[in-house]
Design a protein with these regions (language model features):
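Active-site phosphate-binding and catalytic loops of NTP-dependent enzymes
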Residues: 79-89
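Helix-rich terminal scaffold detector
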Residues: 1-76
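Short, intrinsically disordered, mixed-charge
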Residues: 42-45, 79, 133-140
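Conserved small/polar residues in nucleotide/adenosyl-binding loops
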Residues: 157-160
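Non-DNA-binding regulatory cores of transcription-related proteins
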Residues: 87-155
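Bulky hydrophobic/aromatic packing residues
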Residues: 5, 50, 64-67, 72-79, ...
Length: 160
């Protein structure tokens, strides 16, 4: 008897290797923690929908990357260290602070956040970025130099 066109459990898509996890502490703002939880819930809902209707090979193949993403999100959530922004000092730049940078290019406002909530378009920079590293610990009126691809800049900082 031919086995062609028979759906075997062995036909399931193989598990993908885990996504790399950062070696740095997973500091998050309350907003960042909420975003991680929402991403995990959304991915779980998508997985559940696929498991319940995974009739096609394409749907089954979509499960492997989704399972990998779920493992990564669960690991990031379990390692999250929520920083209480209200307990941060207000006289210097710290994690979670929003800072106005005054330079020859004009004023820009940046918020220093965790790795997973960084978003260049929204001026939310990871605390590990060169800009955040230059700003951390600075006080209003301090001048700091930060390394960037376009060359070093000397900027005055004012905490907002």
């Amino acid at each position: 008897m031919s086995r062609a066109f028979v759906k075997d459990s062995d036909d399931a898509a193989p598990a993908l290797p885990d996504l790399p996890l950062s070696e740095h502490p997973n500091y998050v703002t309350p907003r960042g923690l909420m975003q991680l939880r929402e991403r995990l819930a959304s991915a779980q809902a998508r997985r559940d929908a696929l498991v319940n209707s995974a009739d096609t090979m394409a749907q089954q193949n979509e499960l492997a990357p989704l399972e990998r993403d779920l493992r990564w999100l669960a690991a990031r959530l379990s390692s999250a260290i929520e920083v209480d922004l209200l307990s941060q000092p207000e006289d210097r730049v710290t994690f979670g602070a929003c800072v106005t940078v005054d330079s020859v290019e004009g004023e820009q406002r940046y918020c220093i956040v965790g790795e997973d909530e960084a978003d260049a378009e929204q001026h939310r920079v990871s605390y590990l970025s060169p800009l955040a590293q230059a700003l951390l610990g600075a006080q209003v009126g301090d001048e700091v130099s930060w390394k960037r691809p376009a060359g070093d800049l000397l900027d005055r900082k004012s905490v907002v």
